[in-house]
Amino acid sequence: MNDPKVIVALDYDNLADALAFVDKIDPSTCRLKVGKEMFTLFGPDFVRELHKRGFSVFLDLKFHDIPNTCSKAVKAAAELGVWMVNVHASGGERMMAASREILEPYGKERPLLIGVTVLTSMESADLQGIGILSAPQDHVLRLATLTKNAGLDGVVCSAQEASLLKQHLGREFKLVTPGIRPAGSEQGDQRRIMTPAQAIASGSDYLVIGRPITQAAHPEVVLEEINSSLV
């Protein structure tokens, strides 16, 4: 696959276990997501190990800081050679624009830069608790529009918002969707969920899937089944 749609979320606190899992799967069938826990534990060298094995990496650190600090963190991710990196859209348009501008010298080699809208664990009551009275979907659209205006490549959003965002922001604006569960798997702590085929049909470009793959006895088979369902 030239452009694998599945991004496997790695959530390990043991390096040997993580690499043992990675060695069971084929880099042509998926990409890998490294988040805050693993990056804090194992650092940039872990990402380099994944690159050595041929994997594209989504560095999911959700940077959110003043424009100068955030953009320098994004540049550091580009230097590491990751495929995708993200920032919190709620950091504002100036922060996002600075992060996009700092990637210009990398040309076609630059990572995709993605905004994080509303975390998939958040519901209306959670938003109200931080002073946002809009419905989650309305707030997602507001932040996604801000992200596009800042020149970013797309957003992380739940599959429920995908068709709305494609309609408002265009086909080229990339949608990265967590909360994906293959049919029959546990819901876990993601509140707003959908199957892989449903998510792609709704307009998602990339699907973040964790435990249904990482905890499977035969992850390569699960990946094959998911990819087949997307054809």
Swiss-Prot record:
GO molecular function, one term: orotidine-5'-phosphate decarboxylase activity
Domain of life of the source: Bacteria
Binding positions (substrate): 11, 33, 60-69, 120, 181, 190, 210-211
EC number: 4.1.1.23
GO biological process assignments: 'de novo' pyrimidine nucleobase biosynthetic process; 'de novo' UMP biosynthetic process
GO CC annotations on file: cytosol
Alphabetical UniProt keywords: Decarboxylase, Lyase, Pyrimidine biosynthesis
Reaction it catalyzes: orotidine 5'-phosphate + H(+) = UMP + CO2
Protein's pathway: Pyrimidine metabolism; UMP biosynthesis via de novo pathway; UMP from orotate: step 2/2
Segments crossing the lipid bilayer: none
UniProt-annotated catalytic positions: K62
Keyword check for Transport: no
InterPro entries assigned: Aldolase_TIM (IPR013785), OMPdecase (IPR014732), OMPdecase_AS (IPR018089), OMPdecase_bac (IPR047596), OMPdeCOase_dom (IPR001754), RibuloseP-bd_barrel (IPR011060)
Family annotation (Pfam families): OMPdecase
Subunit structure: Homodimer.
NCBIfam families assigned: PRK00230.1, pyrF
Family from the record: Belongs to the OMP decarboxylase family. Type 1 subfamily.
Function: Catalyzes the decarboxylation of orotidine 5'-monophosphate (OMP) to uridine 5'-monophosphate (UMP).
Protein name: Orotidine 5'-phosphate decarboxylase
Organism per entry: Vibrio cholerae serotype O1 (strain ATCC 39315 / El Tor Inaba N16961)
